[in-house]
Amino acid sequence: ILIARHGKVIYNKSFGYHTYRNSQKTTNDDLYDIASLTKITSTVPSLMVLYDQNKFDIGKTMGYYLPALKTSNKDSLTILDVLTHQAGLLPWIPFYYKLIETLDTSETLFSTKYSDIYSLKLTKNSFANRNIVLKDSLFSSVYSKEFPVLVARDLYLRADYLDTINQTIINSPLSEKKEYKYSDLGYYMFHQL
């Protein structure tokens, strides 16, 4: 937990473990992906308002609300199954792979150990591959109508890449087992409601 005010950290303490096995304690240098949290906290309140206004029924299908899904395998997924992670959606799609030039197939993007190749320190135990090259056609260092999506300081993504993300989700396979498997892909789609 980190609390900061006016740029000054007033509290910073780690609690718990990385897994339920309690074998590795968390540290202040651990890196977390909070994108999933952001998708949920920005989407669920909107869905709740729509539900309270009787404009949204969790028993209806994704295709009912999103016509783009009508011809896909996502058409008949119920909102309830998507919200409870029982729709069979993939747990994760690495969208960033399409944003980078091809790496040597023996190299990964990240490593837990520093080396000549993994020399870009992200956290205490996380290093990025220095050979990563972003595709010029997808990024700009200047904001514009064509590049409005802020990714990082002085780095903007093409507006139409969001369509690529949506199409990748639409075309993704479903698991045949309808059991709990965390996936935030439905939250990407809920933003279109």
Region spans (language model):
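Active-site-proximal loop and beta-strand segments within enzyme catalytic domains
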Residues: 20-182
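Well-ordered alpha-helical segments within folded domains of soluble proteins
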Residues: 42-44, 186-191
